[in-house]
């Protein structure tokens, strides 16, 4: 039998204050003091109360983890925005015991609750019995008091009677009253006992019913937990969280496979990982080695449920977009977008740039609404915020002088300007666009002098685009030439009227009528023949007809009614640009509208900047320039491309954004063009590995010359040798250019530029090929020679002799020997030969033995007899012809 402990010893045993333990006993309904003993039953009652009060041990453990990452999201303007992503993962481990332990625990819990109910019922019964007993005693006391009161009244009424006579009835009455009180007490006690028993039965019945209900609830909970085990709570907030969880699962799975117990590696059954679900893997991981228990799988529960249907989004698509960006906007994986494109018949990679139409088809196919965005919204907003004047005033005509090379364009313009510009051009040919404005008696005229060389096609096209009138210079002694025809085509494409200047009219061999006849074949009809073109006979040397030419130009400009807004922000076109060593990027701009002032913010194509200085064509500083005035401006961020539109804007920050956007847009379009694979180019690309390449680094003094040279060099490419310009630009040859040439094994060509000291050191150290040119003819000719050296040589067979077989002899050393007569040319030893029978080649081999009168000889001439031994051939017959030839290597050139 267990010895009962006191409250004080129990407090010391469980290490808690005595006052707190007494208070806990009181809260449990057990009144105890420090010295009172505690039974086992009271301990259990206290424990049950504490469990109810504080709850049992936690049945689950929840772990939370946060991971942070950065995602780049494309935004307007070509920039990407970094977004911080926080993935919150919550994993709950539920502590579930085995079904047998749960059932035993359930039964024990039910029994414990029933005992507690019975104990509470017994306590209630004892309390009620005490109350009934107390009530019965009080009732008996009241009745006894009433009887005593009645007896005293009777004693007062009955007097003077003998004591003996009254004693017997009083005793009998007292016995009767006591019997009545006992009967009443017994009835009250029975009533109380009956009520207590009924309450005890009812409480026991409720306890039994509650135990049964608890058992059913636990059984249902067990079934629910089994269902939970098979459920997949693999719900994640995003594809990043899902990838992180799968990676973690794979790591845990690998650790479980390689984990050892007792020094012996545990082996797992190989299975098809592709067919396993997430719940299967967790359940397999939960089973312990000995099979004695389970560690229940952890379930990841998020704060929201997986969407049941696809969310349709508004997808904003620009002119170009990559597959990854499109998938990001639709919140799907890139593989799904690629699958959708494959269904539509388009093959793409995740980083490939696709156009707007393809992206729209894919997005609509996947059920999203497409919003097409114009990429130049920022540009349009910047251009609309310009202060332009309202009143248009007459302006000077912009005249472009065009024609064939050496037909006298620059000389004609020199006479008009009374300067000697042609002497400054290398080789006497124009290699830049010269922009000049001259004051005449009848008004101002702006002239653009374009190169006539074949290489400057694009430069001439730019001149025609920026002009109002084209003066076509044709030499009277030379007639219509290829560049003359090209100039006519440029003028027609730009829809610009032509004024024909028939130059060199003072030469004796001049024939103006032939010029008119030839030009009429190309649609340029003189006015006297019913056409629209004015023909003026001029001589740039003698100065004849110059005034008539100027009057014809001004007359044509009056017909055109040329007007421009003089006030407000300026706009124009870049005629030429170059990099000056002391001044930086310099651009020649022809103002077309408004007034360009010093300090204005100019946007030129990909470049922008504030105008720091302006100069006219004579090099004089100016502060403003109106319409039709060409000026050189300084202060741009870099060298703009010739032909770019120059516009004055208000905000330098917005100008910078537009320039950067244009650069990014140009790069995207370039990449999209490169990645577009065409079927017709497939076989050409397959043979690219066999083609030799001539790598060139080209530096020029101005942008136009650089562009023209690049175009001419690329046209020299053939099927066997290709010209590859690895680097080009304006300005001097720098160390960077030399390093690039060394890395790409290229030659360096400088056109009117020189290499600096650091570049020369690199060129000498790397033994690079550096060449300087000032005339484009020489540059192209030398590149042709270099390409010719890279061509594979051509081999040609030349017949040097012919011999007729007259007889055949047998030799033990050489086999069949043909006795021959040389009929043509010479027969040489060790040369390749052909054996002809009836003029048909039957064998081709090598002449092994050549003898004359038993002597070995190296050569036998025409008309002499000899013996010929053919190597590895014995079927020589009388009447055959032996043809001796040699292979000649012919050096090829590029035409």
Swiss-Prot record:
CC per GO annotation: cytosol
Keyword Amino-acid biosynthesis appears in the UniProt entry: no
Molecular-function annotations in GO: GTP binding; GTPase activity; guanosine tetraphosphate binding; translation initiation factor activity
Record-annotated disulphide pairs: none
Compositionally biased region (Basic residues): 258-272
Region of interest (G2), ranges: 428-432
InterPro entries: DNA-bd_dom_put_sf, EF-G-like_DII, EFTu-like_2, IF2_assoc_dom_bac, IF2_II, IF2_N, P-loop_NTPase, Small_GTP-bd
Biased composition (Low complexity): 100-109
UniProt-annotated stretches for the region Disordered: 50-217, 232-302
Region G3: start-end pairs: 449-452
Keywords (A to Z) from UniProt: Cytoplasm, GTP-binding, Initiation factor, Nucleotide-binding, Protein biosynthesis
A Pfam family hit: IF-2
Annotated region described as G1, given as residue ranges: 403-410
Entry keyword Cytoplasm: yes
Protein family (similarity comment): Belongs to the TRAFAC class translation factor GTPase superfamily. Classic translation factor GTPase family. IF-2 subfamily.
NCBIfam families in UniProt: IF-2 (TIGR00487), small_GTP (TIGR00231)
UniProt-recorded name of the protein: Translation initiation factor IF-2
């Amino acid at each position: 039998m267990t010895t009962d402990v006191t409250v004080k010893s129990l407090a010391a045993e469980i290490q808690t204050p005595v006052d707190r333990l007494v208070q806990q006993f009181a809260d449990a309904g057990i009144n105890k003091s420090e010295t009172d003993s505690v039974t086992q039953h009271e301990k259990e009652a206290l424990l049950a109360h504490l469990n109810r009060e504080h709850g049992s041990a936690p049945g689950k453990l929840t772990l939370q983890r946060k991971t942070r990452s950065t995602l780049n999201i494309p935004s307007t303007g070509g920039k990407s925005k970094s977004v911080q992503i926080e993935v919150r993962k919550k994993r709950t481990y539920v502590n579930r015991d085995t079904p047998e332990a749960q059932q035993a625990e359930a039964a024990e819990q039910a029994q414990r609750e029933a005992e507690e109910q019975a104990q509470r019922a017994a306590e209630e019964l004892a309390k009620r019995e005490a109350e009934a007993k107390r009530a019965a005693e009080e009732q008996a006391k009241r009745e006894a008091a009433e009887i005593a009161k009645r007896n005293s009244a009777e004693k007062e009424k009955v007097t003077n009677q003998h004591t003996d006579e009254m004693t017997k009835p009083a005793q009998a009455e007292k016995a009767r009253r006591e019997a009545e009180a006992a009967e009443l007490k017994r009835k009250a006690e029975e009533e109380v006992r009956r009520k207590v028993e009924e309450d005890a039965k009812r409480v026991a019945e409720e306890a039994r019913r509650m135990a049964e209900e608890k058992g059913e609830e636990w059984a249902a909970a067990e079934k629910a937990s089994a269902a939970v085990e098979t459920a997949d709570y693999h719900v994640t907030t995003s594809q990043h969280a899902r990838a992180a969880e799968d990676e973690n699962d794979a790591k845990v799975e690998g650790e479980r496979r390689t984990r050892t117990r007792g020094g012996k590696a545990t082996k797992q059954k190989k299975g098809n990982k592709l067919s396993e679900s997430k719940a299967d893997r967790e359940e397999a991981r939960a089973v312990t080695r000995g099979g004695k228990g389970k560690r229940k799988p952890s379930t990841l529960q998020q704060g929201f449920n997986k969407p049941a249907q696809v969310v349709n989004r508004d997808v904003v698509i620009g002119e170009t977009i990559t597959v990854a960006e499109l998938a990001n906007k639709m919140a799907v994986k890139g593989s799904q977008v690629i699958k959708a494109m494959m269904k539509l018949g388009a093959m793409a990679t995740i980083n490939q740039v696709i156009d707007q139409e393809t992206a729209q088809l894919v997005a609509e196919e996947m059920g999203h609404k497409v919003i097409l965005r114009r990429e130049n919204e920022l540009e349009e907003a910047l251009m609309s915020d310009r202060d332009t004047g309202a009143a248009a005033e007459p302006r000077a005509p912009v005249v472009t002088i065009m024609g064939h090379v050496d037909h006298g364009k620059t000389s004609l313009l020199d006479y008009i300007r009374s300067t000697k510009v042609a002497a400054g051009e290398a080789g006497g040919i124009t290699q830049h666009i010269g922009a000049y404005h001259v004051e005449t008696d009848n008004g101002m005229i702006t002239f653009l002098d374009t190169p006539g060389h074949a290489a400057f096609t694009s430069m001439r096209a730019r001149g025609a685009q920026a002009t109002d009138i084209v003066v076509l210079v044709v030499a009277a002694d030379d007639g219509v030439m290829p560049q003359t025809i090209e100039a006519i085509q440029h003028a027609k494409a730009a829809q610009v009227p032509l004024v024909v200047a028939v130059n060199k009219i003072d030469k004796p061999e001049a024939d103006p009528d032939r010029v008119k006849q030839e030009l009429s074949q190309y649609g340029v009809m003189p006015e006297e023949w019913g056409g629209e073109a004015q023909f003026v006979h001029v001589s740039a040397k003698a100065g004849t007809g110059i005034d008539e030419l100027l009057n014809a130009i001004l007359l044509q400009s009056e017909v055109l009614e040329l007007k421009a807004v003089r006030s407000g922000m300026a706009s124009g076109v870049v005629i030429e640009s170059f990099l000056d060593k002391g001044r930086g990027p310099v651009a020649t701009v022809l103002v077309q509208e408004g007034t360009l002032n010093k300090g204005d913010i100019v946007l030129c194509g990909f470049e922008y900047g504030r105008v720091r200085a302006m100069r006219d064509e004579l090099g004089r500083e100016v502060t403003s320039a109106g319409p039709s005035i060409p000026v050189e401006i300084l202060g741009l961020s870099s060298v703009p491309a010739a032909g770019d539109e120059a516009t004055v804007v208000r905000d330098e920050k917005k100008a910078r954004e537009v320039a950067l956007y244009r650069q990014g847009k140009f790069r995207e379009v370039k990449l999209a063009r490169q990645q577009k694979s065409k079927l017709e180019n497939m076989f050409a690309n397959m043979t690219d590995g066999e083609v030799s390449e001539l790598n060139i680094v080209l530096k020029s003094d101005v942008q136009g010359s650089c562009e023209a040279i690049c175009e001419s060099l690329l046209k020299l490419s053939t099927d066997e040798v290709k010209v590859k310009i690895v680097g080009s630009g304006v300005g001097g040859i720098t160390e960077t250019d030399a390093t690039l040439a060394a890395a790409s094994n290229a030659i360096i060509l400088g056109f009117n530029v020189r290499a600096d000291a650091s570049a020369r050191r690199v060129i000498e150290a790397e033994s690079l090929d550096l060449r300087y040119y000032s005339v484009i003819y020489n540059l192209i000719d030398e590149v042709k020679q270099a390409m010719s050296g890279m061509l594979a040589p051509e081999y040609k067979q030349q017949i040097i002799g012919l011999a007729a077989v007259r007889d055949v002899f047998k030799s033990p050393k050489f086999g069949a020997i043909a006795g021959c007569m040389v009929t043509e040319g010479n027969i040489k030893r060790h040369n390749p030969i052909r054996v002809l029978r009836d003029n048909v080649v039957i064998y081709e081999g090598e002449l092994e033995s050549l003898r004359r009168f038993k002597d070995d000889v190296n050569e036998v001439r025409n008309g002499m007899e000899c013996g010929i031994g053919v190597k590895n051939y014995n079927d020589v017959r009388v009447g055959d012809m032996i043809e001796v030839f040699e292979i000649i290597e012919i050096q090829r050139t590029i035409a």
